[in-house]
């Protein structure tokens, strides 16, 4: 299957750095993911649908490697044999992950995700069918009462979309987001995104999520949001939420509502903390778990409740 160069105005802004070949793919409305496996294989996906092959516009693997390095450099990071993996955000809502050809894989791999609904609020998400009026009222009550929440779900289920929409309900508050790659992107004048930094070629200069959470606490936040908790930053965040920093939110990868506790326990072990102790800390800090999933090709809030 091939795309025409332009069907209508795309759902997102396409940065010049992407180049004409990649831009022609991303210009097609509805595209959410483009996956490039060397110069011969290109796949695309439209809003929570299935992956479909696309005739590759690229000619050599060297072209893919240069494209990957240019994309990563445009996001302020570097990609080379010493650092063969990198993740950046470029333009308005485009996230790029690149893996340079190495012993891990013989070809350069590029994964691009486009956030089509970057500025949706809770009301707009409700109209798409992601949740109903009852859930809408509950989500707004959580925010109004400054309760802490954790949004869990699988990759592509809409965790960041929902987190962004919830935070957008608080335009007058100073919100500090801690992220690996800037994706939340609120338009509020009091929104700040702190992003991690990879180490340089000498192994120095790395800035982790855990470090950024600690720094955010010193910046007089009204709310703290963590783009994705998966390590020591979870403990730092819940300790902050347990000591007066209310109204915070974060996302977590999990396959079901019931598996959230085991995921958190596993993170505890990574932090050299017994799983039950980590769960006790989280239960004291997090008031609500919001689980999102994909049903029939559409994103849905499937359950809202206390940590199981």
What does each of the following model-derived ranges do?
Residues 1-53:
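N-terminal anchoring/assembly modules that precede and organize ATP-driven motor systems
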Residues 20-24, 71-87, 173, 271-276:
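Active-site phosphate-binding and catalytic loops of NTP-dependent enzymes
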Residues 43-45, 51-145:
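P-loop NTP-binding catalytic core
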Residues 136, 149, 165-285, 291-295:
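Switch/coupling sub-region of P-loop NTPases
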Residues 151-153:
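Hydrophobic anchor at the beta1->P-loop junction of P-loop NTPases
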Residues 156:
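Walker A (P-loop) phosphate-binding loop of P-loop NTPases
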Residues 159:
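Conserved lysine of the Walker
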Residues 162:
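Hydrophobic positions on the alpha1 helix immediately C-terminal to the Walker A/P-loop
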């Amino acid at each position: 299957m091939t795309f025409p160069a332009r069907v209508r105005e795309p759902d997102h802004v396409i940065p010049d750095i992407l180049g004409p070949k990649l831009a022609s793919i991303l210009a097609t409305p509805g595209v959410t993911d483009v996956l490039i496996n060397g110069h011969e294989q290109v796949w695309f996906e439209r809003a929570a649908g299935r992956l479909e092959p696309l005739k590759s516009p690229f000619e050599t693997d060297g072209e893919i490697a240069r494209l990957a390095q240019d994309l990563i450099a445009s996001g302020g990071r570097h990609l080379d044999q010493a650092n063969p993996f990198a993740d950046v955000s470029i333009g308005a809502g485009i996230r790029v992950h690149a893996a340079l050809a190495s012993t891990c894989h013989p070809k350069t791999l590029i994964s691009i995700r486009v956030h089509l609904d970057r500025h949706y609020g809770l009301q707009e998400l409700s109209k798409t069918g992601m949740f109903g009026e009852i859930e809408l009222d509950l989500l707004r009550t959580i925010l109004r009462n400054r309760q802490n929440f954790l949004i869990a779900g699988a990759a592509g289920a809409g965790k960041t979309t929902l987190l962004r929409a919830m935070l957008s309900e608080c335009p007058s508050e100073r919100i500090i987001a801690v992220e690996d790659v800037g994706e939340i992107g609120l338009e509020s004048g009091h929104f700040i995104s702190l992003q991690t930094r990879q180490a340089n070629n000498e192994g120095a200069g790395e800035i982790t999520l855990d470090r950024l959470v600690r720094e955010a606490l010193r910046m007089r936040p009204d709310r703290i949001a963590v783009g994705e908790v998966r390590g020591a930053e979870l403990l730092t965040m819940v300790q902050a939420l347990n000591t007066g920093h209310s109204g915070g939110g974060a996302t977590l990868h999990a396959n079901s509502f019931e598996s959230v506790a085991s995921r958190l326990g596993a993170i505890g072990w990574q932090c050299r903390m017994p799983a039950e102790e980590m769960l006790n800390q989280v239960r004291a800090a997090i008031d609500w778990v919001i689980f999102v999933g994909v049903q029939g090709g559409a994103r849905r809030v499937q359950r809202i409740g206390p940590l199981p």
